[in-house]
């Protein structure tokens, strides 16, 4: 069986286990990672790579860091083959309809809390703040 191609969009530590799991799965090939640009962190304002970028480079996966994915999407899409799936885990930007229609099979979002109670960011922190006795993860196909 041919491996399904994935473009992975994610940024924080929360997204790294999902990226690693997809890379380890023999049914998938993560061909590209898209993450937020490196940002100044701390008092020293040291330029720091997002955790997903660090993991992707360790795994040998090419990384793109557009400031605004929607604005740069046409250039990105023209430079690589359409993936079977676009997997988004805590990427940090709203995606345009053009981005959502890019994958051949589906754009998939992994959200850090069960929907609909856990809408928005940061879902895990909201669960703790509201004293939720349990929480979960929502996996959904994005359409709009």
Model-derived regions, located:
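Short acidic-hydrophobic, aromatic-tinged amphipathic segments that line or gate anion-handling sites
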Residues: 63-69
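Donor/substrate-binding cores of folate-linked one-carbon enzymes
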Residues: 85-144
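Short amphipathic alpha-helix with an adjacent loop that forms part of the alpha/beta core around
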Residues: 70-82
């Amino acid at each position: 069986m041919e491996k399904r191609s994935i473009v992975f969009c994610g940024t924080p530590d929360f997204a790294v286990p999902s990226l690693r799991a997809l890379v380890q799965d023999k049914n998938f090939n993560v061909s590209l990672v898209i993450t937020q640009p490196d940002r100044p962190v701390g008092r020293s304002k040291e330029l720091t790579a997002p955790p997903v970028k660090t993991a992707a480079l360790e795994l040998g996966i090419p990384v793109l860091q557009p400031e605004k994915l929607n604005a740069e999407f046409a250039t990105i899409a023209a430079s690589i083959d359409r993936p079977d799936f676009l997997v988004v885990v805590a990427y940090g930007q709203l995606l345009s309809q053009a981005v959502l229609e890019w994958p051949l099979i589906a754009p998939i979002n992994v959200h850090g809390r069960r929907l609909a109670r856990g809408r928005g960011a940061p879902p895990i922190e909201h669960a703790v703040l509201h004293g939720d006795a349990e929480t979960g993860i929502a996996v959904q196909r994005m359409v709009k």
